[in-house]
Regions:
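Catalytic domains of riboflavin
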Residues: 1-228
Length: 228
């Protein structure tokens, strides 16, 4: 698990749009948020374009029902074009996305935060290059590192700031990734429960899940309560 430091990493976070959003899981409100970071030096192991040192970050929130009276279900989902849109079976991303939307709909309330961190933060083209390396026998972590990136370049400050902007201070977080729990807690948002987002494994991504568990610390057993 990575260590997160408290602090406001953005000069501003603003709501840019809001609209009705019917889906096959039910009606949501869809919100668009834009975060502008304070000046900082980009991490060379996570930057595909050093000239773009401080680009605005965009994120979408799907909100269903009353999320203010009790700690809501929250899912932080990182964009995965290949899985979420094309149904790739190299990963479990689409299955996790659909599980989150279905769970929120069954609960009648919750928040899905969809952020643009394709390929665990390295971007779409490097992600496809990593696929090619995986075809040659490297695993998902080794492929990222072979390309000069960290195993996981994602940071989760923007979801935390959006939750605070929405007045959310406690959540039931749907994740298998301890880093997401740590990021929210370090931002002052209490994770009262970790809800599992484990999906049924398939042969095509069984190794991928094993690597996430063994090398990245992801949790593959059932959910638990968190009071940290």
């Amino acid at each position: 698990m990575r260590t997160y430091n408290r602090g406001m990493p953005f000069e501003s976070v603003t709501k840019a749009a809001e609209a009705d959003f019917p889906t096959r899981w039910g009606h949501f409100r869809i919100f668009g948020f834009v975060g502008t970071r304070a000046a900082e030096t980009p991490d060379p192991a996570c930057s595909t374009d050093p000239s773009q040192s401080n680009p605005p970050e965009e994120m979408v929130a799907l909100v269903m029902g009353d999320v203010s009276s009790t700690p809501p279900i929250v899912r932080i989902h990182s964009q995965c074009l290949t899985g979420d849109v094309f149904g790739s079976l190299r990963c479990d991303c689409r299955l996790q996305l659909e599980l989150a939307l279905r769970t929120i709909a069954e609960e009648g309330a919750g928040i899905l935060l969809y952020e643009q961190q394709e390929g665990r933060g390295i971007g779409l083209m490097p992600k496809l290059q990593a696929y090619a390396l995986q075809d040659k026998g490297l695993d998902t972590v080794e492929a990222n590192e072979k390309l000069g990136f960290k195993a996981d370049c994602r940071v989760f400050e923007l979801p935390a700031e959006v939750l605070k902007l929405m007045g959310i201070t406690q959540v039931r977080l749907m994740t298998n990734n301890p880093d997401k729990v740590a990021a929210l807690e370090s931002a002052g948002i209490r994770v009262v429960e970790r809800m599992s987002s484990v999906v049924e494994s398939q042969e095509s991504f069984e190794k991928y899940l094993q690597v996430k568990r063994d090398k990245m610390g992801h949790i593959t057993e059932e959910a638990d309560s968190v009071n940290s």
